[in-house]
């Protein structure tokens, strides 16, 4: 049972890449 959905995690990763 994951607290954060995988799609949310992928979105955060994408935003992190864009910010970086």
Curated annotation (Swiss-Prot):
Cofactor(s) this protein requires: Zn(2+)
Recorded superkingdom: Eukaryota
Molecular-function GO terms, alphabetical: metal ion binding; metallopeptidase activity
Cofactor annotation remark: Binds 1 zinc ion per subunit.
EC top class, as a word: hydrolase
Enzyme Commission numbers on file: 3.4.24.-
Protein transport as UniProt keyword: no
Further details from the record: On the 2D-gel the determined MW is: 43 kDa.
Function of the molecule: Hydrolyzes alpha and beta chains of human fibrinogen and human fibrin. No activity against the gamma chain of human fibrinogen, human thrombin, bovine serum albumin, ovalbumin and hemoglobin. Has anticoagulant activity on human plasma and protects mice against death due from experimentally induced platelet thromboembolism with an ED(50) of 40 ug/kg.
Protein name (record): Fibrinolytic zinc metalloproteinase
Organism, scientific name: Ganoderma lucidum
């Amino acid at each position: 049972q994951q607290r954060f959905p995988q799609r949310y995690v992928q979105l955060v990763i994408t935003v992190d890449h864009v910010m970086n």
